[in-house]
Curated annotation (Swiss-Prot):
Binds 1 zinc or iron ion per subunit. SUPFAM superfamilies: Composite domain of metallo-dependent hydrolases, Metallo-dependent hydrolases. It is found in: Cytoplasm. Zn(2+) binds at residues 69, 71, 239, 314. Its cofactor is Zn(2+); Fe(3+). Pfam families: Amidohydro_1. Pathway: Amino-acid degradation; L-histidine degradation into L-glutamate; N-formimidoyl-L-glutamate from L-histidine: step 3/3. GO terms for molecular function: imidazolonepropionase activity; iron ion binding; zinc ion binding. This is Imidazolonepropionase. N-formimidoyl-L-glutamate binds at residues 141, 316, 318. GO terms for biological process: L-histidine catabolic process to glutamate and formamide; L-histidine catabolic process to glutamate and formate. InterPro entries: Amidohydro-rel (IPR006680), HutI (IPR005920), Metal-dep_hydrolase_composite (IPR011059), Metal_Hydrolase (IPR032466). Fe(3+) binds at residues 69, 71, 239, 314.
Length: 403
């Protein structure tokens, strides 16, 4: 009888705050971390009776990385719009000519489930290739009942196909469905009364998100959707304070939001309300870069008041066409002046909090699922120093090496 399934020795690791630890051992049993800590404190029975053991030679082991904000499922792309933007055409003019988000909506509606899988699976596999073991995927390019459900179904299937843990987020409130043009309130009513309950009844939704902004949904409409989610016992998230300060972060915090995302225009009141609600700030440097934004999220304020900060790709065709969480880590250091430990925590522990999964994943602690990444480096700073490099040496999901 073996005391454990896998014993990892002579490793460097990081703690939940992102600080590096040396001479560490990790014990894996039945897909979870049985024990972890300094190797000189390793209980003898694990050392004597391990089914398998690996000498890591001082190389870094992190928790499996977590991309906690993506719009990964969609059809087509918007490269033609990128060309127009470079020629000086405004986003408003692009939208008036049929471009923008509604062009992605049309392409996504036109695609079958199989076509969506064919186009989206490579994006998920690209994240997996960087050591990402958990991904949040939003709907929001269907904007009607049939196609929002289709997107959520595809997201679930992608997780099974890729061997990646997928959490789904219903983002029907991404934009107003074209059938409801000029009547956003009727769309919100339909979303709350028909779309969201259907997604819940089919077990397709884990969380609910709203894009609360002057160009999207009002505070009153966001609250209506949050209340509908609460009535269905679904946790909420919010695209908040990206383009202006509407007070969306305070509203979301009042409903116990797991996270508020973007936050370039967050003020102190919103940050304090987020602290009280234990709400995570999800920062999205890819969108900041691609949109050439000038206003940075208030990282110093978030630090001062104690809001946990996560980082994600925001992978989407309109404002962050990337599948590299490693690149986002480097960008967060350079653009947002985040420290290396902050960034490492942001894509592990804080990202798990943003998904409400911190009891199971996000840090190397006894009792948690054994999602781990072994890197061919010894200094954790290298993960932020390089651009989208190095790739993992090996990745473990639930106690099994998958690469």
């Amino acid at each position: 009888m073996f005391a454990c399934d896998e014993l990892l020795l002579n490793a460097s690791t990081i703690d939940a705050t992102g600080l590096q630890l040396s001479n560490q051992a990790i014990v894996i049993k039945k897909g979870r971390i049985e024990w972890c800590g300094s190797e000189d404190q390793l209980p003898a029975h694990f050392q004597e009776s391990a089914k398998s053991r690996k000498d890591c030679h001082g190389q870094l082991i992190t928790p499996g990385l977590i991309d906690c904000h993506t719009h990964l499922v969609y059809a087509g792309h918007r490269a033609a719009e990128f060309r127009l933007k470079l020629q000086g055409v405004s986003y408003a003019d692009i939208a008036k000519s049929g471009g923008g988000i509604l062009s992605t909506v049309q392409m996504t509606r036109d695609a079958s489930e199989e076509e969506l899988i064919d186009q989206s699976l490579p994006r998920l596999l690209a994240l997996k290739n960087e050591g990402v073991t958990t991904v949040e995927i939003k709907s929001g390019y269907g904007l009607d009942l049939q196609n929002e459900l289709k997107m959520l179904k595809v997201a679930r299937q992608l997780g099974e196909m890729a061997g990646v843990r997928v959490k789904t987020t219903f983002l029907g409130a991404h934009a107003v469905g074209p059938e409801f043009k000029g009547n956003s309130q009727a769309y919100v009513d339909f979303l709350c009364n028909e779309m969201l309950p259907a997604a819940k009844n089919m077990d397709l939704v884990d969380t609910v998100d709203v894009f609360c902004e002057s160009i999207a949904f009002s505070i009153r409409q966001a609250e209506q959707i949050f209340q509908a989610a609460k009535d269905l016992n679904l946790p909420i998230k919010c695209h908040a304070e990206q383009l202006s300060n509407m007070g969306a972060s305070s509203l979301a915090a009042r409903y116990g939001a797991l996270s508020c995302d973007h936050l370039e225009f967050l003020d102190e009141n919103g940050a304090l309300n987020m602290v009280k609600a234990n709400t995570v700030a999800v920062l999205l440097p890819g969108a900041f870069y691609f949109l050439k934004e000038k206003q940075k999220p208030p990282v110093d304020l978030l630090r001062q008041v104690g809001v946990g900060m996560a980082i994600a790709t925001d992978s989407n065709p309109g404002s962050s066409p990337t599948t590299s969480l490693l690149l986002m880590m480097s960008m967060a250091c350079q653009f947002f002046s985040m420290s290396i430990p902050e960034v490492l925590s942001a894509v592990t522990y804080q990202a798990s909090r943003a998904l409400g999964m911190e009891k199971d994943i996000g840090s190397i602690e006894a009792g948690k699922i054994a999602d781990l990444v072994l890197w061919s480096i010894k200094d954790s700073a290298a993960l932020c120093y390089y651009f989208a490099y190095p790739l993992p040496h090996q990745t473990m999901v639930a106690g099994e090496w998958v690469s």
